[in-house]
């Protein structure tokens, strides 16, 4: 199934990291979003007929505030009632940075294991390299490099 990663607060950036790792390492489509945003629109998509093609991953923190905990539980319940698989990844650590890195590490490893389970080399980046090569041939990289170096930062 296609991973959809949901984070909140500082875990929104972690959700994006996990999405990109599933894309690059596992070579699968993956999506991410943040709570509470998803409860204003995206939650409706789980009522659709394609919903069973996804696995929803919630990034959790044992110290999340009461309101966020209630929101996550309510959202999770609706998604499970729609028949989807839900996974919760719990952060570990004594401070925000440790918790973020614990989830990043777990996501990175999961993306590599998924690639290996699918018989795919997680370090091969054919499509990315092909795009870079086409850009280089078109002179875009050189042009961008010149533009960036001319910026006064």
Each language-model region and where it sits:
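A SIS-like phosphosugar-recognition module
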Residues: 1-153
